[in-house]
Amino acid sequence: SFSTKKFVELLYDYSTAPNGYYREIHRDSDSRTLVFLIYLNELCEGGSGGELNLYKYNKTNDKIPSQPKKEDCSLIKSIPPKTGTLVAFLNSHDSLHSVSKMENHSNLRHFLYGSFTLLGKKNTFLDKSDGKLKTNFNIFE
């Protein structure tokens, strides 16, 4: 709502993903409001995987789990890792996504991952040495 101020912080991480890298279907932490991914390179020809996959949860009467079973989801879109591609989405309880397993690539998948994250949620803590708010961000949490 526009009547309540919420403080957010931009958190980002440069990462690489080797052969064998994948992420199961999941949704991000509730503290992340807007999530983005920027692909920095293309993967070699002849390999497979590395796509960001977006899903819809099929069970209408159930609460959506943070890591639903694949058989309970339908693939909406698959986005290949191409240089300069920016993917962004509002994070919510139904923002389900995965990364398909990378196989037979001779190079790494380079990308920036980030989010606008609400302060005061699980990604934050108060540093006892100086009393200032610090953040802890890790793409693989």
Regions of interest found by a model, annotated:
Residues 138:
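Catalytic and substrate-binding regions of extracellular carbohydrate-active enzymes
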Residues 1-130, 134-135:
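Catalytic core of non-heme Fe(II) oxygenases with the double-stranded beta-helix
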